[in-house]
Amino acid sequence: MNRTIIAIAGGGFSQHIPAYIDEYIINEVRSDGAVRICFIPTASNEAQGYIDRFYEAFPHCDASHVTQDKLASPLMQAFLNEQDVLYVGGGNTQFMLKKWREAGFDALLKNAYQQGAVLAGISAGAMCWFDVCLCEKEDGSYEEVQGLGLLAGTFCPHYQEPARKEAFDKWQTEAIIQPSYTLTDDETLHFRNEELLAKLIT
């Protein structure tokens, strides 16, 4: 059984419907019926408009989403294991990881990944899979945050932004974290069994 992570720097259904990268994710799933895809909007603090766009983007799938009050549900692991795709939205990486760890949801995601669920995510939802990431704070500065460690190294989305690029380059030079992936908003990385399979430009 292959393990798959698709790390999206920007774009996707939050900007375009239909979006090529979202079709690409669905095509990764081998399913006889409707693809079961679950959206995890923790990083946006469950912004309703974001959730609505998710359902609009995947009308032919068996779509669902997970709210913060359900993260620690005793039924959550079984639910996640039933999904073909777990799609993590963008937003505040630090807030998202804190909520996940408080609920033990990070461990549930790792287990679902080992069971064959495709992990996909955009921006914060892409950074989180790596060992460590550099995250923007509310005051515009940046801080190092420990990721889930499913993929080695670090990942920087939105690398076309001058302030982010400068902060990341300085941090990466001092921290010497490898591998180090820097992506602009039209780029995506596809990993299979923790190895980089492809870089997509959309």
Language model region names:
Residues M1-V85:
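N-terminal beta1-alpha1 cap of cysteine-dependent amidohydrolase-like domains
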Residues A7, V85-G89, A120-G121, F155-C156:
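Structural motif
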Residues G11, G91-Q94, G125:
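Short glycine-rich anion-binding loops that position phosphate/pyrophosphate groups of nucleotides
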Residues Y55-E56, K137-D139, A198:
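Short, hinge-like loop/turn segments at secondary-structure boundaries
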Residues A63-A117:
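Flexible gly/pro-rich beta->alpha loop and the following alpha-helix that scaffold active-site loops
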Residues F79-L80, N111, G147-G149, T173-E174, ...:
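Solvent-exposed alpha-helices and their adjacent loops that cap or buttress functional pockets
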Residues L97-K99, D106-E166:
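Class I SAM-dependent methyltransferase SAM-binding "motif I" and its flanking Rossmann-like core
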Residues F155-I201:
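Conserved anion/nucleotide-ligand pocket segment
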